[in-house]
Design a protein with these regions (language model features):
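Non-heme Fe(II) oxygenase catalytic core, chiefly the N-lobe of the double-stranded beta-helix
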Residues: 1-246, 251-280
Length: 280
């Protein structure tokens, strides 16, 4: 286990996830603190900060210490901070944003390396987010299946993401009823993390349409097995939100799933995604 001098790191599960103490997003952080937070992210795949009181501009400044914020495709950001996407579910809505296991926007040629979600308003119960370790998911496969997967390419599509899972008000604001442009990209089913060198599964029911060179009928049996395998309980952690909580996860090796179990209540989150590279 890595020794930290400037922050406190407390794992929340055996598979992944750790709460970080000693970090205030509203302040200008020392380089040493930023370096340790980055190490904690690489070690634990998703990290959590509590009791943050940062403004949108302070949240953006914090995010820029770890990468380049980018706009979320097809949805508008805050007027005063376009790189921050409001993730909102209102009392009358039934669907939540991204309500399925996924790694963010893999239908982009260069998907984001990480995402930050800051809780502004949370329901009295429910609305947790689950995360799954894709290093462990890959390493738990048999040698034979790992050899089969190495070299396979998945085709990701924004059409597969199913826009009906996102809140209708946000979509109306984004395009005034216009049909969103379908985005598509090809990525390896097994990617190598550019910083750790470890291999991770990189496919999801949310975005992967089929395997390149295979028909959909041929692809689905293998993909469905992987989608179930990727989120086995022993690969996961679950985070309970409170106002001022921040989650920062590594999309290159972790999946997430926002639980939609708080109907009748309002939930408001501010999300930032950080630019990534082309998976290899």
């Amino acid at each position: 286990m890595r020794n930290y001098r400037h922050i406190e790191v407390k794992p929340i599960a055996g598979a992944l996830g750790a709460e970080i103490a000693g970090v205030d997003m509203a302040r200008d952080l020392d380089d040493e603190v930023v370096a340790e937070v980055r190490h904690a992210l690489l070690d634990h795949l998703v990290i959590f900060l509590r009791n943050q009181k940062a403004t949108p501009q302070q949240q953006l400044a914090f995010a820029r210490r770890f990468g380049q914020p980018i706009e979320y495709p097809q949805l508008k950001g805050l007027p005063e901070a376009p790189m921050i996407t409001p993730v909102v579910k209102l009392e009358h809505e039934r669907h939540n944003f991204g309500g399925i296991w996924n790694s963010d926007t893999t239908y982009l040629v260069e998907p984001p390396m990480g995402s930050m979600l800051l809780a502004r308003e949370v329901p009295p119960y429910g609305g947790d987010t689950m995360f799954a370790n894709q290093y462990l998911a890959y390493e738990a496969l048999s040698d034979g299946l790992r050899k089969t997967l190495d070299g396979l390419v998945g085709i990701s599509s924004s059409a597969k993401a199913d826009v009906t899972r996102t809140r209708e008000d946000a979509l109306k604001q984004a395009g005034a009823g216009a049909t969103p442009k379908t985005l598509q990209a090809e990525h390896p089913i097994v990617r190598t993390h550019p910083e750790t060198g470890r291999k991770a599964l990189y496919t999801s029911d949310a975005h992967t349409a089929c395997i390149k060179g295979w028909t959909e009928a041929e692809s689905l049996p293998l993909l469905r097995f992987l989608w179930q395998h990727q989120v086995r309980p022993e690969f996961t952690c679950r985070f309970r939100w409170a106002t001022g909580s921040l989650a920062f996860w590594d999309n290159r090796c972790a999946m997430h799933n926002p639980i939609n179990d708080y109907h009748g209540f309002r939930r408001v989150m501010h999300r930032i995604t950080l630019a990534g590279d082309k998976p290899r």
